[in-house]
């Protein structure tokens, strides 16, 4: 949510900032803005409501010249999406700040600042920071010290980039509870919410830690200070994925590209993590075996799509590893009186590693007596990775589309590796382990086969063009896949969709079924198939139109109002992964037919970094 870009260079920074904002569009936003310090130390600002293209048009009409600047895409929290509320915010004509996060004590600070003569022109909590920084700068006459003093007064989450005309060759940044990275160039330095924003200018990054304050200045090395004010040497990391991840490579949308990348993503998630007959516990870290050997129960905490991955893992852990599992929505978990039995492992799932509620849950869990914490994450160097005892990187590469696709399947692969690792230490049948390992090796090929059905799925999607509601059904470990299918459809097509265990039809949802309510189901050939088929007959008897994705061996005939698409057979343990793909493609094509913004659906953000 929101995006920050900052640049200190020996060249004009407007283009750098603008390209950075374009690359952050996937995060979700409603306005954009930029402030640049000219060489004669004038602070010039431009803001626009809507897409980055609106800001670009304004800049085309009147460019901002200068070698130091900050820019921002805003996701409205305090105050409506207006130019007045867009970032950067200024205090007078000297100081500008951009901010991601939420300041919880902004009303108290605002009253204090107003009593001191500061005048507010917006509805945002960020303007409080601008005036607070100006007050501290007036006292200290040093921007770094002003930021240090100001952040001690802030309650809540923030990532900041600040510039001042009295020190026109530098930017000061700070972070707490919201991500911020430093881009290290040759004779120039940058700040951003996400490395993707800076890939055109550098592939070397410093991931700031919680409480860090950073000073980037022309002709000087980057200086990072911890929360205690001590100068720290932070490691510089080289970005591994290359700049191609931020391009569509000929696909119409990032989402479609990312769906079609899943064979390679699954292969990458498995690379080096399997022996001939088992998963390698060492993949989770050098301390993994010592921690896993103590595990008698697992708590999984996540949000959104990652939560659905956790729900699938609950079935796996109980069925194959013989370990009870509990799955929690992060925003609910941290406000409950949680009972933690002895020997419980705490597992977090997050694509970005910066999801605010998941991070807060991890910090809450530290004091609850878990045997250890494991982060399954896609972003190395993220807060979740740094703060967990063990990590498993999903190796999905950058995911630009707001609706998660390849990150979800790679999380499922990681969770199966966790299941096999815990199962081996808990007496799981060795031959069954070997069967699943072999099935994992063939999974990328099976996914490729499913992607070959794209045209047939696109044809099915035409039935959804005029629909306003849909119902998804699944049983067992495929109920979470139905939940994920419903989430995808509502996220990007804006069709209201719900998911239920198929056995719950008679307990309410059946009342909704008629010819205008398409019902989508997944039908793998497992022990629940016959019960599922009975549930589907109940739908047909009420005039519902069925769309069934079934194993190629399932005896289920097409008929009027019954559409069956057959998928290749896969080991039933991995069927939830395979059956995810047709639901992703169905949602994608329905959204295209509806004419929605597939990659950036309304009101949603890719990385939810505020609570």
Give the label of every model feature segment.
Residues 262-266, 270-299, 380, 390-518, ...:
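Active-site phosphate/pyrophosphate-binding segments
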């Amino acid at each position: 949510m929101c995006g920050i870009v900052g640049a200190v260079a020996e060249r004009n920074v407007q283009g750098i900032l603008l390209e950075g904002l374009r690359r952050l569009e996937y995060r979700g936003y409603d306005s954009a803005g930029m402030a640049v310090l000219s060489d004669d130390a004038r602070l010039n600002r431009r803001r626009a409501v809507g897409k980055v293209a609106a800001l670009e048009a304004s800049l085309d009409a009147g460019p901002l010249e200068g070698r130091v600047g900050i820019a921002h895409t805003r996701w409205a929290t305090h105050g409506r999406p207006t130019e007045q509320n867009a970032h950067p915010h200024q205090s007078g004509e000297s100081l500008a700040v951009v901010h991601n996060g939420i300041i919880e004590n902004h009303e108290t600070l605002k009253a204090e600042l107003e009593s001191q003569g500061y005048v507010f022109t917006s509805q945002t909590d960020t303007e409080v920071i601008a005036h607070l920084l100006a007050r501290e700068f007036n006292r200290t006459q040093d921007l770094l010290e002003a930021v240090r003093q100001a952040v001690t007064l802030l309650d809540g989450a923030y990532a900041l980039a600040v510039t001042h005309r009295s020190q026109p060759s530098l930017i000061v940044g700070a972070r707490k509870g919201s991500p911020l990275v430093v881009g290290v160039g040759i004779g120039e330095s940058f700040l951003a919410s996400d490395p993707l924003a800076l890939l055109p200018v550098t592939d070397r990054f410093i991931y700031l830690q919680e409480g860090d304050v950073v000073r980037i200045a022309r002709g000087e090395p980057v200086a990072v200070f911890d929360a205690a004010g001590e100068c720290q040497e932070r490691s510089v990391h080289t970005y591994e994925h290359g700049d191609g991840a931020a391009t569509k490579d000929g696909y119409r949308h990032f989402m479609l590209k990312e769906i079609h990348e899943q064979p390679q993503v699954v292969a990458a998630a498995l690379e080096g993590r399997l022996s001939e007959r088992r998963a390698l516990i060492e993949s989770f870290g050098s301390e993994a075996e010592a921690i896993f050997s103590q595990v008698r129960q697992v708590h999984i905490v996540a949000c959104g799509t990652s939560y659905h991955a956790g729900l699938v893992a609950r079935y796996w852990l109980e069925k194959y590893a013989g370990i009870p599992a509990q799955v929690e929505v992060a925003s609910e978990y941290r406000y409950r009186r949680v009972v933690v039995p002895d020997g419980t492992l705490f597992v977090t799932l997050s694509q970005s590693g910066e999801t605010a509620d998941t991070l807060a849950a991890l910090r809450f869990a530290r004091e609850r007596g878990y045997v250890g914490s494991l982060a399954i994450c896609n972003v190395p160097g993220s807060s979740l990775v740094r703060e967990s005892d063990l990590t498993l990187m999903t190796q999905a590469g950058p995911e630009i589309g707001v609706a998660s696709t390849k990150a979800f399947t790679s999380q499922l692969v990681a969770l199966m590796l966790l299941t096999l690792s815990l199962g081996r230490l808990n007496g799981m049948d060795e031959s069954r382990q070997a069967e699943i390992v072999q099935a994992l090796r063939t999974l990328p090929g099976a996914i490729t086969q499913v992607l070959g059905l794209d045209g047939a799925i696109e044809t099915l999607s035409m039935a959804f063009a005029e629909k306003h509601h849909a119902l998804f059904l699944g049983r067992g470990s495929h109920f979470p896949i139905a939940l994920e299918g419903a989430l995808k459809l509502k996220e990007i097509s804006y069709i209201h969709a719900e998911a239920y265990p198929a056995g719950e039809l008679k307990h309410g949802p059946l009342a909704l079924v008629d010819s205008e309510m398409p019902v989508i189901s997944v039908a793998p050939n497992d022990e629940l198939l016959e019960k599922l088929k009975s549930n589907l007959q109940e739908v047909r008897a009420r005039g519902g139109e069925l769309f069934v994705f079934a194993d190629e061996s399932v005896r289920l005939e097409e008929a009027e109002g019954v559409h069956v698409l057959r998928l290749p057979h896969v080991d039933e343990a991995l069927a939830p992964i395979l059956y995810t793909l047709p639901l992703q493609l169905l949602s994608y094509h329905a959204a295209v037919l509806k004419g929605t913004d597939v990659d950036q659906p309304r009101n949603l953000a890719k990385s939810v970094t505020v609570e």
